From Swiss-Prot:
Upper classification of the organism: Bacteria, Pseudomonadati, Pseudomonadota, Gammaproteobacteria, Enterobacterales
Principal subcellular localisation of the protein: membrane
Cysteine pairings via disulfide bonds: none
Protein name per UniProt: UPF0756 membrane protein YeaL
Membrane topology: Multi-pass membrane protein
Domain of life of the organism encoding this protein: Bacteria
Organism: Escherichia coli (strain 55989 / EAEC)
Record HAMAP family: UPF0756
Transmembrane segments: 14-34, 51-71, 86-106, 121-141
Length: 148
C-alpha cells in the first residue's frame, strides 16, 4: 500500500537537504525511522513530550556558556549597561514571548505545523534565510490569525 505520509516526510527531508537545513532533515529522517520500525508505538509519547524535551535541550544549549564559564559574570553585568545589549535583551524578551505564543498555537492548531515547516525550508532555500525554527514563526502567525 502506498504511504502518502512517508512520501511527504521524504519530500520535506529532501527540502531540508537542498536548503542545507540539516536540523530539519535529520529530524525528519529520525521520524521516518520511527515510522517504519516498531518504534512507531512511541509516537503518542513523542507527540505529547517532544516539544517540551526539545525546549529543554535548546535551553541547555543556550545556557551552556554561562554554566561553563565561557560567558563570564562580568559580561552579563555589562550587558545591562550598554544600549545595544539592552536592545538585545528587549528583542530576546519579545522573541521568547512570540515563541510561547507559537507553542500554544502549534498545540491548538497542529495543522499549521506543516505549513510552518515548509515555509521555513523554502525561506532558507530560496531567500538564503536562516532556519530559526517554527516556534517563532508560529508566534508570528498567532499574531495574524489569533491564538485559539
Amino acid at each position: 500500500m502506498f504511504d502518502v505520509t512517508l512520501l511527504i516526510l521524504l519530500g520535506l527531508a529532501a527540502l531540508g537537504f537542498i536548503s542545507h537545513n540539516t536540523t530539519v532533515a535529520a529530524s525528519i529522517l529520525v521520524l521516518i525511522i520511527v515510522r517504519v520500525t516498531p518504534l512507531s508505538t512511541f509516537f503518542p509519547w513523542i507527540e505529547k513530550q517532544g516539544l517540551s524535551i526539545g525546549i529543554i535541550i535548546l535551553t541547555i544549549g543556550v545556557m551552556a556558556p554561562i554554566a561553563s564559564g565561557t560567558l563570564p559574570p562580568s559580561t552579563l553585568i555589562h550587558s545591562f549597561l550598554n544600549w545595544k545589549s539592552l536592545v538585545a535583551i528587549a528583542v530576546g524578551v519579545i522573541v521568547s514571548w512570540l515563541g510561547g505564543r507559537g507553542v500554544t498555537l502549534m498545540g491548538s492548531q497542529p495543522q499549521l505545523v506543516a505549513g510552518l515547516l515548509v515555509g521555513t525550508v523554502l525561506g532558507v532555500a530560496l531567500f538564503r534565510g536562516v532556519p530559526v525554527g517554527p516556534l517563532i514563526a508560529a508566534g508570528l502567525v498567532s499574531l495574524i490569525v489569533g491564538k485559539q
